[in-house]
Amino acid sequence: IPAYHVLGNHDMDNISNDDFLSTTSNPGDANAKAYYSFTVKGVKCIVLDANYNEDGSHYDCGNFDWTYAMVPNEEIEWLKKELNEGNEDIIVFIHQLLSKSVPACVCVQNASEIRSLFESNSRVKVVFQGHHHEGHYEEINGIHYITIPGMIEGESPENNTYAVVELDKNGRILVDGYRKCPDRILETRK
């Protein structure tokens, strides 16, 4: 079973970005970066990396303030290209939030710019996020933003939160949540 990694701030607590990337492999177009794309069963998946400091440096060995995250210009240009290629439905994965109705400290600084790119492309159906340990759901202009609850809140099994997701043939998003992650059946925009 292939594994895909979405880099988060806790991944950079004690190791460098380069060390993390050298010990993992992501199928698809990783290009030695923590942002990349891949296609599974006719669905394009885009993984974004917002682990950047205000000065543009990447999070590295604890050199960051977890309340600041941004998607840099180079990655935005790559994202524009990815959004314009192909005709598959798109699912996006990112650690920090792109939502609007959550505390600013858990959001990407340039979230509105990223959301507007998604909103201009009807193929973007859902964004899966982390970082906000409580979890969250929000629909913004027809796109679903689902924040999976944190799985680092304790050592007991109920904290091992995850979800199995399916885009069905009718275009619905089926989220089969485990433990603290709620189940959802969501209609997608056309």
Per-region residue spans from a language model:
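Extended active-site neighborhood of metal-dependent phosphoesterases/phosphodiesterases
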Residues: I1-K81, E85, E113-V124, Y137-D176, ...
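Charged helix-capping and loop-helix junction motifs
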Residues: V106-I114
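Short acidic, glycine-rich surface-loop motifs adjacent to enzyme active sites
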Residues: L83-V102
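Metal-dependent active-site segment of extracytoplasmic phospho-/sulfohydrolases and closely related
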Residues: V124-G130
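Active-site glycine-centered loops adjacent to acidic/histidine catalytic or metal-binding residues
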Residues: G8-N9, H95, G130-H131
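Secondary-structure transition/turn motif
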Residues: G177-D183
